[in-house]
Amino acid sequence: MRTIAPKPFTFESGKRAVLLLHGFTGNSADVRMLGRFLQDKGYTCHAPIYKGHGVSPEELVQYSTKDWWKDVLMAYDSLRRKGYNEIGVVGLSLGGVFSLKLGYTVPIKGIVTMCSPMSFRSKEQMNEGVLRFAKEYKKREGKNDDMIEAEIKQLSPTSAIDSIQTLLQDVQQSLKSITVPTLVVQA
């Protein structure tokens, strides 16, 4: 079965904009319903897709938070170039971490983080999560168990996970620099 890669979206509505940021291994589909809801409330919403997301796990692990941060900044700059001066940011998981980083990096009106980590128990636990994601992705591709196991043995998400850990530490150290209204939703 061929998987169709998701696409970034922009839902035009009002003069104020919301940048919607997905999590690690996720994509814009994860925030699409929220985007439609906010559009109905008069907000223009834009959701990018970070490099390597929405595609194969092998492609995902070729990138790091430095690449994804550039994608976030490009999405923010895109809204600014379109004339949006009032931009809020809503992020899910890793997207929430990027939302916090935006809060002390560029002018924004407010932040919502949803289920965003500030640390993780172990790299092994994160590694297992990536491998579970990879296994499910490959099942959707229609691959058999032997093929999946062989491909997963070749997958090494270590550098991507290390970059997430570094980002979390950097954001933790800068939280006190955030001065805009911030809602933290944690479950």
Please place each PLM-identified region on the residue numbering:
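Active-site nucleophile loop of the alpha/beta-hydrolase fold
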Residues: 112-122
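Gly/Ala-rich beta-loop-alpha elbow adjacent to hydrolase catalytic centers
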Residues: 91-95, 99
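The serine-hydrolase catalytic nucleophile loop
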Residues: 25-36
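Active-site nucleophile elbow and catalytic-triad environment of alpha/beta-hydrolase enzymes
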Residues: 157-174, 180
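Conserved alpha/beta-hydrolase
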Residues: 38-57
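Catalytic nucleophile-loop/oxyanion-hole region of alpha/beta-hydrolase
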Residues: 56-82
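Conserved alpha/beta-hydrolase fold motif
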Residues: 86-89, 111, 184
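Short beta-strand/loop motif that positions the catalytic acidic residue
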Residues: 177-187
